[in-house]
Amino acid sequence: MNGTAIPVQELTCQLLDTAAGIPADTAAAGLIISHGHFLHRDAFRRTITAGTSICTGQPLATIGWDAALRALETGLLPCASSEQAILRIAASLGDPAIPVQLACVLGNLDRTNIGLVTAAIVRANGSGTGPASTLL
């Protein structure tokens, strides 16, 4: 099932619960959530797979980073340049096989979004202190 039918607050919890304990995944999901744009877009939510844990029965959700970038690149997920930058950085944090050219994306970010990215990078490094506390 994709994430389009799940209320945003519930989807937020499921994404964070699924990523819990994996700093880079938590940072990637947290960046998308904190940005406040993507979880309100059906085109993005279709890249989210939702289900339940076979061990605990808890609801879970994961972002298909390749699918999200493919939607972006094929025009199915139109975004402003700053939104594209956030998505590309989050995808790179969430999937180590996805590279990001920081020199190309950072110039598209305003002060607020630079703060979100900085917090995500700190969180991905496994630090629970400093700017990461502003994330989420």
Question: What residue ranges belong to the model's regions?
Answer:
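Long, hydrophobic alpha/beta structural blocks
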Residues: 83-86
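Extended, charge-biased low-complexity segments
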Residues: 1-78, 96-136
